[in-house]
Amino acid sequence: LKYDSLPELPQMTENVRYDGSLKASVILKDLAPFVPALSRFEEPLDLNLVFSGHGKHLDCPTLRLTNHHGLMIAGEAALSNWDAGMDMYIYGKLGNLTMTKEGINVLMTNLTGKVPPILQRLDYIRFNGEAAGYLHDLTLTGLFYTGAGMVKTDVMMSIDEQSMSRTYSGSVASADLDLGKLLNQEKKFGKVDFNVELKGFNYKNRYPESYIKGIISSFEYSQYQYENIMLDGVYKDGGFNGRLSMDDANGSVQIDGNFNVAKTIPDFNLKASVKNLRPHDLHLSDKYENASISLDLTADFTGKSIDDMNGRISLDSLQLNAPDEGGCFLDNLTITAGQVSGEKELRINSSFMTAVIRGDYSYHTIPASVVKTVQRYIPSLLTIKDNMPEPHNNFQFDICLENTEVLSKLFQIPLELYLPASLKGYFNDGEEKLHVEGHFPEFRYNGTRYDSGVLFCENPSDRFKCSLRGGMLMKSGAMLNFSVEANAKNDHLETTINWGNNTDVTYGGKFAADTRFFK
């Protein structure tokens, strides 16, 4: 008997009948010449097989496979037209497939050389179900039981005979999958109840691809159970195009459009509507108790962050309802970013503020720009940390605040403007220069009223200079005027503070300090 492929086997007519049984200890590595993936399976498996058939039809009413590492497979199977290639018909029933934690580790180590952490956290796997259909269209139904919960599957696997690529369509559902255990983040995530339909699920370019439609009935996150989350769209190349929505007792969210954060330069083109979202009740914030937020958002931009953003974000009809503290309303805030005359430019426009930032900027390195500039003049006071990023900022900024109602209510900043305020200047790391100039004509901070506030910081020559002056309204109604001047050079800091009042009985004072730093 010469065997090279199934067609090489003797041709059997329907009149040929056969039966038999096999009890043996087998080593799957011996089949590695035919199935290379079995090359690591050196442990013996106990096989118990009973079969019978006629012609090209084979029945296996008994199929049992076990080992000494917590693996057991028990079921039955049938094959029709077993030499028909992709047109072979298969029926299989697994009454019990069980793998202990040790069995999972042995199986995955032999298959891939390593065990994915997510499988290590399953503790065990039990499966019972059926597989039926032609090899090119095979339906798989059954129940998976694991240490993280139960999953029900009803999926058809289709194989393209030309490319031999596999696609999967069907439904996957669970009522109690412990996502926190799977992700090893049990403090953040809890159980999820979902029923999802997939169409054409496959892998292309290292990413899964599928049409997805379904409902997540409940999802525990941050000790809160979200409800009624709907998905309807296409997941492809690491991105999603479709609709995501949530209709929870503590807020509703609907997102339409597409986004892809897996690209080298992520892109977003979507619209979002948020209604009566309660961040405190959702455990998203320890602030905003008894408050709700509603807004509409339109985003059409590319970029990983504000540093390389190119496009537009528009926030409309922001409504904060806070019965205890009063609410606020913002009709629109628009952020646009891109290239203007060969330079990056970021613009913010709204009824309460405008801002323009132009040049080469990186927001997360701005603190490093300040520290490294000041460190030139007081090196013994400021130490540059090894992990501090190297800044290359060279930009100008001009910010104007008309009022701070939104900032104070939304971000709970205790600042109130009576007149518009401005902040402008520049950073230039190449020349090791900075200039910051702020004007705050009249404002209240943390309950105290000030006027004529002016701030200057710059290093025009061989020293770093900062000055702050203004007036503070006292409880008696008198105005206390003050100024602070600071000059730093060569580990030497000169500080002068002046103050005085404007009442009938005047008083004032001056405090001067000369500080030297050593290391």
Regions found by a protein language model. Give the residues of each.
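Interface amphipathic segments
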Residues: 1-519
